[in-house]
Amino acid sequence: MNIDSLKNEWEELNKEFAELESCNRRYIELLEQLHSHQQICFNEIKHQRYRMNQITTSLRQFKGPVPAEDKEKVDDLHKMTLKRKAQLHEIEQSLPAKSGRYLQIILGDVNVSILNRNDKVRYKDDYEKFKLILNVIGLIMAFFNLIFNYRALELAFIFLLVWYYCTLTIRESILKVNGSRIKGWWRAHHFISTVAAGVLLVWPQGEHWQIFRMQFMYFNVYISIVQYLQFGYQKGLLYRLKALGERHNMDITIEGFHSWMWRGLSFLLPFLFIGYGYQAYNAWTLYKLAYSPPDAPWHVSVMSGLFLLLFVGNMATTLWVVPEKIRERAKERYRLQSMGKSMKLRKEMKNSASDLDLSSGSKLSPTATTTTSIATATQTPAEKKET
């Protein structure tokens, strides 16, 4: 290849680079527009909540006996308020959220918001797969520790627990930022478990550890099995939530979702309660070990307290969450309806953008078509209503 051919190739590359610069300028403009629309949405959500609080406060005067006509209107307003809260929550899922203090300490001031619904589902799915893989590894290592009494194998397993729970706390904090409704106790549970694993890691080899060792390994084998059952339950929930919004002919209704959720939960609860009982048994065993044999290291009493704390927290939270879910079925129904509509709307917008690309390919350049599609996607709910 001679120098003239290379020169011509460079000139062609320059033309392509000019197109790239033009595309990048449009991209930057759209990013600025996106930020502007996000601020508008934040302000409108704040305004909606302020007005709703005023209406809710005014409704309190109708708590006493009211005429039948007014009672029906009051009930309708209460239902519409619940529905609007669910709608606002769903809108917030498409907007960036601030990281919590824990993430700011661990990762710094980094934006971890996932704005695309499918990406959120994918991240949640990846989180569940991560737990499954690590639980299988933990199950295998705990099983080997039951067969072989090697200190190096014990330390490797306990170090795995420390790393696993540390990673879970970070991933769950990211999920929380992105709208996950995980209860505060379950996050605290993993922080406490991290501390417990750290105490186990520095627990010196001795008579007290050898007495408790086998019981602890059996406990981990059982917990790994329960985690596998939980993985199946969570995967089923994710699939059905996805089906609510992504299927044109939905293969599951909201009533069907609730029915499956309660069946799965009723199957899982006995295994969970047995696990909680095992935690209480561990706490009692360690409490006795703290006094006999004598000269027990401080790790014994600390681990006894941590297992007791985990038992009380898990039992109380589970017994509180199940009745709460029953009481809030109406609110949950509105949330699922809003989620389903939002996911279907996003899919329709995506399909419309694809149809536009095909139909106007001869009239618009690829860059212009992309600009149109992104501009449509960044419209606020108010703008979409006006159009």
From Swiss-Prot:
<feature type="transmembrane region" description="Helical">
    <location>
        <begin position="264"/>
        <end position="284"/>
    </location>
</feature>
<keyword id="KW-0812">Transmembrane</keyword>
<dbReference type="Pfam" id="PF07851">
    <property type="entry name" value="TMEM120A-B"/>
</dbReference>
<feature type="modified residue" description="Phosphoserine">
    <location>
        <position position="365"/>
    </location>
</feature>
<feature type="transmembrane region" description="Helical">
    <location>
        <begin position="302"/>
        <end position="322"/>
    </location>
</feature>
<dbReference type="InterPro" id="IPR012926">
    <property type="entry name" value="TMEM120A/B"/>
</dbReference>
<keyword id="KW-0325">Glycoprotein</keyword>
<feature type="transmembrane region" description="Helical">
    <location>
        <begin position="216"/>
        <end position="238"/>
    </location>
</feature>
<keyword id="KW-0472">Membrane</keyword>
<dbReference type="GO" id="GO:0045089">
    <property type="term" value="P:positive regulation of innate immune response"/>
</dbReference>
<comment type="similarity">
    <text>Belongs to the TMEM120 family.</text>
</comment>
<feature type="coiled-coil region">
    <location>
        <begin position="1"/>
        <end position="39"/>
    </location>
</feature>
<feature type="glycosylation site" description="N-linked (GlcNAc...) asparagine">
    <location>
        <position position="111"/>
    </location>
</feature>
<feature type="modified residue" description="Phosphoserine">
    <location>
        <position position="354"/>
    </location>
</feature>
<dbReference type="GO" id="GO:0050829">
    <property type="term" value="P:defense response to Gram-negative bacterium"/>
</dbReference>
<feature type="region of interest" description="Disordered">
    <location>
        <begin position="346"/>
        <end position="387"/>
    </location>
</feature>
<dbReference type="GO" id="GO:0016020">
    <property type="term" value="C:membrane"/>
</dbReference>
<keyword id="KW-0175">Coiled coil</keyword>
<protein>
    <recommendedName>
        <fullName>Transmembrane protein 120 homolog</fullName>
    </recommendedName>
</protein>
<feature type="transmembrane region" description="Helical">
    <location>
        <begin position="155"/>
        <end position="175"/>
    </location>
</feature>
<feature type="transmembrane region" description="Helical">
    <location>
        <begin position="191"/>
        <end position="211"/>
    </location>
</feature>
<feature type="transmembrane region" description="Helical">
    <location>
        <begin position="130"/>
        <end position="150"/>
    </location>
</feature>
<feature type="modified residue" description="Phosphoserine">
    <location>
        <position position="352"/>
    </location>
</feature>
<keyword id="KW-1133">Transmembrane helix</keyword>
<feature type="compositionally biased region" description="Low complexity">
    <location>
        <begin position="352"/>
        <end position="381"/>
    </location>
</feature>
<keyword id="KW-0597">Phosphoprotein</keyword>
